Amino acid sequence: MRRNSLSEKIGACGAMLRDITPLTVSGRIVSVSGLVVDVAGLAGQAFVGDQLLLYGRDDASVRAEVVGFHDGLAQALPFGPLNGLGPGQTVSLLPRSAGTLAVSDGWLGRVVDPLGRAMDGRGPLPLGLLPRPIAAAPPEATHRARLGDRIALGVRALDLFTTCRLGQRLGLFSGSGVGKSTLFAMLARAAVCDVAVIALVGERGREVREFLEDDLGPEGLARSVVIVATSDTPPVLRRRAAYTAMTVAEHFRDQGRSVLFMMDSVTRFCLAAREIGLSAGEPPSTRGYPPSVFADLPRLLERAGPGKDKGPGATGFITALFTVLVEGDDTNEPVADAVRGILDGHVMLDRRIAESGRYPPVDVLRSLSRAAQGCLTAEERLLIRRARGIVALQTEMADLVRMGAYRPGSDPAVDEALTLGPRIESLLRQERTEQTSLDAAFQMLREALGPAGLPQ
């Protein structure tokens, strides 16, 4: 791990000094409507993204984020309940450092909230030397490294049919109740990486502890930082959880490490952004989503990937897996369509496959890794191509076979598909705790296809 140079530390201190608000800037609450608090007296002092401290009755206070301006008033969304807030109460502008995180290696093994505070009852988090803005820009495209070698995800269906590379971004698309969370847990436990950063955005509260103790386990947690914003938290915190998690991942990537970033789910991030946009007065457009939602998506997703090119062995990578909960199993709904256009590949989970009892229910014919060709050997490409062809032909002929309309021996290619297809299906079936290396997965596919699957 490289130590930060003295000049970098001095530069960071200078940035912190520039961001300090020299005097206490105060305003007052004008109105409270829905989720929005309108604040007067901050013109020229507060900007979008700044944080405020709202003082309610009985000396209680709650933080809020400025999300827009209207008629000279700052529109703020609180990080907590609105109870006790009313017109005339005092508002203070917090220093710009409130929008940064001082991440350190001591965060490994910890559970963190969207504001960078510990949630696991193990005391405060150790702070790093360099505060990072949570709304940082992605690395410049011309200075970014290229994708690295392939990474073992530990799930055969993905390692074979959507082979992933270091720095690649994959989306896991699924309807509700299809098995997305199960696959997410398998990947969190089995994927090979130096550090895992896991964002649970809008999850049910009861599922968080189950994930930490049953799915991740002590060994998995030791190499991970988990950022949690449950479904009952305000939308501004649910959205911030994703940015906080990405900021943590960037800290470890900039050290030259291989980081696995996992987020469940992008859909709930977009729903939170929709609540914020509509509350700020944005007009709804596609299916009720305001334009800002589709502007936020690339700003977040593009931050994952390779870091700056520092040469072999020194470049860090954020390999990202984003889950997308599609509405009504419609993979072309606005969020799914936008995410699929940004990412480097997609894994489609199919309800019919799940109902047949095969888990994980990955539809290998509809799943794709755009970067796989750059990390497969000629023999492996042939194996995958043949396996896809067999699965496609078996799927095409399934109805005719069930009806008894196909007579064995009529077509050698169909006969081969009907013979080898069940072997591939068996290969794709995997228990939650079962792990397979990349080499073992390809060897299992060779054995399933038999001699005909090998290059001539």
Predicted regions located by residue number:
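Glycine/charge-rich, flexible interdomain linkers and switch-proximal surface loops
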Residues: 24, 106-107, 245, 317
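P-loop NTPase catalytic core
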Residues: 160-161, 167-456
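A broad, low-specificity signal for short, low-complexity segments enriched in glycine/proline
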Residues: 1, 12-15, 35-39, 130-135, ...
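P-loop NTPase nucleotide-binding/switch module
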Residues: 91, 99, 119-168, 181-186, ...
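Short, charged, intrinsically disordered terminal tails
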Residues: 1-14, 444-456
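Acidic-enriched and Gly/Ser
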Residues: 2-11, 18-22, 31-153
